[in-house]
Swiss-Prot record:
Organism for this UniProt entry: Streptococcus suis (strain 05ZYH33)
Keywords linked to the UniProt accession: Acyltransferase, Cytoplasm, Iron, Metal-binding, Transferase, tRNA processing
Main subcellular location of this protein, as a coarse class: cytoplasm
Gene, per the UniProt record: tsaD
SUPFAM superfamilies reported in the protein's UniProt record: Actin-like ATPase domain (SSF53067)
CDD domains: ASKHA_NBD_TsaD_bac (cd24133)
Record flagged with keyword Metal-binding: yes
Protein name: tRNA N6-adenosine threonylcarbamoyltransferase
Cofactor note: Binds 1 Fe(2+) ion per subunit.
GO molecular function ontology, one term from the record: iron ion binding
Domain of life the protein comes from: Bacteria
Amino acid sequence: MMKDRLILAIETSCDETSVAVLRNDAELLSNVIASQIASHQRFGGVVPEVASRHHVEVITACIEEALLEAEVTAEDLTAVAVTYGPGLVGALLVGISAAKAFAWANGLPLIPVNHMAGHLMAARAVKELEFPLLALLVSGGHTELVYVSEAGDYKIVGETRDDAVGEAYDKVGRVMGLPYPAGRVIDELAHEGQDIYDFPRAMIKEDNLEFSFSGLKSAFINLYHNAQQKGETLSNADLSASFQACVMDILMAKTKKALEQYPVKTLVVAGGVAANQGLRERLAAEITDVEVIIPPLRLCGDNAGMIALAAVSEYNKENLAGWDLNAKPSLAFENL
């Protein structure tokens, strides 16, 4: 009987410390996540130094808990996977150092994983993916369309020229006085309000697959501040509905254009913003000629489960790292 392949994965690219254990291709035995949101909320965003310190404090306990929950020991493991970019350099280094130490101490190979490949391959938790496919990756740090010809072969075909969509959500949320992170709250408010403000939909009609959200963000902030100066009170629900409608129009337009240029049977939508109910509703209503796969909510945000799922194809291709593996905070798909 063939021995199960067990991969321990570590994710520390931003403000979540996460460790997971994956059995074979897609069975997550554990996915421990230690969130730092409470520590960053008073700053209105992630403070890199604070994030790194928190990772150092909890990484060992997370590894122990992941193994305990999975009911496996270090001796049972096949390999260790770790996010090495993109992300905050200090945060990444904590995870990489822990992964190296654990792998070295237990004589295990080390698998380097691109954080965004992790988001994309989280869809494997839903079903085994058929290639080629197109992916819309939407998060706090990225907004990009990726053509995947086969597992582990990624090509960015369109991306944001300025703000990522999740970043835009957090910035307008801060203006409205909403807690960080603001995406979920804005999504909820949007379902209560009306789309009554006409915000600019940048580049929506241009014949490319590029995104831009800085103009939308500026228009939102100007509208809000002008109303304040006049002593007017605007409805956060209506503002959220109008902002979200604009974002979704842009995302849907570019995704449809990409599907025209890259005829595939599957569209994967992943990243933290993939948890957005408004986005899921628009996808269900408007993308009907290809299969749309969205990871479960627990795998949309940063987590080590997705890193383990992405590590499978890297391991199968024998794409292993040496002990000199370093953090690559600006890592892109093209230079994997």
